Amino acid sequence: ELFKNVVFRLAPIGRNTARRMIRSIKGYEMLTGFRGKPHADIEEIERLLVGLSQLVTDNPEIKELDINPLFVHGAGSGATVADIIITLEQE
């Protein structure tokens, strides 16, 4: 959102697609230890994306899912979803 850069894929996605999605965002350098900062837990972001993809696949009533913000901690330390909005299909 900060960089006005988002990435979308149709579910389900696997780990390789998740990795490519992450690498395609403008802020990717910030996740890799830019200017001496610690590396972010990119593997956890991958796991989160794959898990959310499976959640949406298993629950077709989910129309839209928005996580904002997602706080990514240092490598091996995970990530925290601070807020999530799930929009369901109206019948």
Question: How should each PLM-predicted stretch be described?
Answer:
Residues E1-E91:
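ATP-dependent carboxylate/acyl-activation modules
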